[in-house]
Each structure stands twice: as C-alpha cells, then as structure tokens.
A protein has these predicted regions:
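Local sequence-structure signature of Cys/Sec-based thiol-disulfide redox active-site neighborhoods
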Residues: 3-19
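Conserved small/polar residues in nucleotide/adenosyl-binding loops
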Residues: 149-155
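Structural alpha/beta surface segment adjacent to cysteine/selenocysteine redox centers
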Residues: 17-115
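Anionic group-transfer/hydrolysis microenvironments
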Residues: 12, 38, 154
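Histidine/lysine/aspartate-rich catalytic loop segments that bind and position anionic ligands
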Residues: 113-114, 118-123
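Strongly charged, low-complexity linkers/loops
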Residues: 126-148
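Short, hydrophobic secondary-structure boundary micro-motifs
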Residues: 77-79, 105, 120-121, 137-141
C-alpha cells in the first residue's frame, strides 16, 4: 500500500493553488490527502506577519507566484480582493460529501486565483454550490455544525 502525502491548503493561499495545479497537471491527485488549514491562524500561531500585510513581502510574493505560474504554464491572476477571510469556504470543504469535494475545491480555487472572483461574495458562493449540485440552505446549516477542530495545523512527527 502506497502512503499518501498530506497536502495542507487554504483557498486564500496562492502557493496552495499553484501546488494543487501542479498535482492536477501531473495526474497525481489520488496520491495526496488534502487537509484544510486556516493560513491566518497558522501565521498567528507562529507569530508571523502574513505577507498580505507587509508591502515588501507582498510584492515579492506576487512576483514569485507569477513566475511559478508562468514556468508551469498555469493560468493565474493575482486576486484583487486578496486577502479574504476563508473560514466560511474552508468549513464548507469539511462539510461537503467526499464525492463533491474535488469539484468544490477546484471551483473555489479557480474562481479566486484563475478568474479573479470574490469567493467571499454570497452570489459567487451560490454559483459554486449550484455547479457542485449542493443545496445552499443545507450548506449553510452544515457549516455551522462543522467543528473548528477539523481545520488542522500541521504537526511535527
């Protein structure tokens, strides 16, 4: 049995998006165990000022992500709304049935980092849910029941 690689992601992370696209392009998605994290919480835990709130870091991150996208031929647009609060969408990922997770995941990432959409906007979210054939009211109810403990931080082993 082949061991899966844990892939920690947050929809607001351009690096998560770019890494995910490399995984998709190499047809290796089944080798990865996708785990939702809250990147802002990770920064806070480490006492790190996120690049989004440091002008120099932000400039370097934008340039770095653009270079990575160009090198790997990945459609990528820096989102005008960066950063957003991704808690709602990340909880949604945990709530959604496994057979719809991949589609939800891809649509959220593409909307934000490929199509420059505001994925914190209710209409954008409803559009994503419709494409995934997920009832909006069930989604709303479900994410309220999702525990924060399911949003993980990587641990050293």
């Amino acid at each position: 049995m082949t061991k899966k690689i844990d892939f920690y992601f947050d929809f607001i992370s351009p690096y998560s998006f770019l890494a995910h696209k490399k995984i998709i392009n190499s047809n290796d998605r089944s080798k990865f165990n996708y785990k939702a994290i809250l990147l802002g919480g990770l920064h806070n835990l480490g006492g790190i000022t996120a690049p989004a709130f440091n002008e120099r870091k932000m400039k370097n991150m934008k340039n770095d992500c653009t270079l990575i996208a160009e090198k790997n031929k990945i459609d990528f647009i820096w989102n005008d709304k960066f950063p957003i609060n991704s808690l709602y969408l990340m909880r949604g990922y945990l709530f959604i049935n496994n057979n719809k997770k991949d589609k939800y995941f891809d649509l959220c990432f593409d909307a934000y980092w490929k199509n420059n959409e505001d994925i914190s906007n209710e209409e954008t979210i409803k559009n994503i849910l419709t494409k995934c054939e997920i009832n909006h009211n069930d989604f709303e109810t479900g994410i309220k029941a999702v525990s924060y403990t399911h949003l993980t931080l990587p641990t050293s082993t």
